[in-house]
Amino acid sequence: CLENQRSLCESHVTDCVPFYELLEVLAEEVAVSTFVNRVCRLTGRRNLCFFQNGHRERFMAMGEKCSRAIEEAATCSAVYLLSADRFLWSRALEVIDQEEIHFSKIHIHGVDLDGYVLFHMARDLYQGSRHVRLSELTDPELVSDRIFEWIMTACVIRRHGIRVLREEERRIDRSRIGQ
């Protein structure tokens, strides 16, 4: 019963709290200074870019194909990361269905370092595995700021579900109208 109350409470909080504040809460929970510092630099910009270079279109197309599966936080967060990289997406597209993501069928040969990190982080968020270490995430030579931003977005999606993206897009649309 308490778990149901927590979920309901988190649902209301997620719909009200700006995305960057959800990232700050995540950073506080991790409490490793290099991670906190990197998240703080990210949230200091306050204009996070959720989608660019066809990412939104690839993500939304999968949402239409697998509308039921994309509502699950684990699937949504993994699809968000897999669709961020055009080459990785071309490898993953055919192995995602209404039931699951078949990571063992995704052949990542030829993917660059960014795609490699996105693939393994997507698998970790989806399966609950731990292939990507925190020390790797905090190293800007291994994980670029753009990839780190997408990974942090996926972590918040994993925790709060697709409604985080929907609410943030509404917030962005409202700010554009107000300009």
Ranges and model annotations:
Residues 1-111, 127-179:
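Extended, charge-biased low-complexity segments
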